[in-house]
Amino acid sequence: MNDPRSSQHQPPRTLYAVLEFGRAVQEMTTLLPANRWLSGLPGGDGQPVMTLPGFGGADGSTSLLRRYIGKWGYEAHPWSIGRNMDPGSARNMGGVLEFMADVVRLVGARLHAIRKKSGKRVSLVGWSLGGLYSRQLAATYPDLVRQVITLGTPFGDPRSTIVWPIMRRFIDSPEPPEADMARWM
């Protein structure tokens, strides 16, 4: 660890990651009192908006967000393809990459259907890993995606996150970190 370049890819301290849960709870409890203020915001334009959940999440994890999106006058859609990265799909890096390709293909089909029905391009709201998918979907289907909004999406080198060592253990990768890194990017 004497290489000065390796220090730039150190994950944050575990304490900071543990404290994130408390911060998330605090932010959720402020949502209810803020409801009156949020209700006074200008209404949407009826555009279709799809939510994409974070790692391990499914449509239920974005249901409150979709409720607000619908309340603001947008046409809210779940991604409707199940859990984001179920453990069976993530046994190795090949499985992860295959799952990601399936997500782009399946959500792409949903985007086509929504565009055909509404005549409008779809805005994507991606939470965490869902934000990474949203960016890939916009690049793959620019004629179907109006805009991308990301919430807590991990941009940058994944080795600088608390999740990197967990993901490497989770997928039981035999590759050196640099090889996994190249496949992710």
Which positions does each model-derived feature cover?
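Flexible, membrane-associating and regulatory peripheral segments of lipid-active enzymes
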Residues: M1-M50, G56-Y68, W72, P78
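Serine-dependent carboxylesterase/thioesterase catalytic core
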Residues: Q47-R66, G70-M185
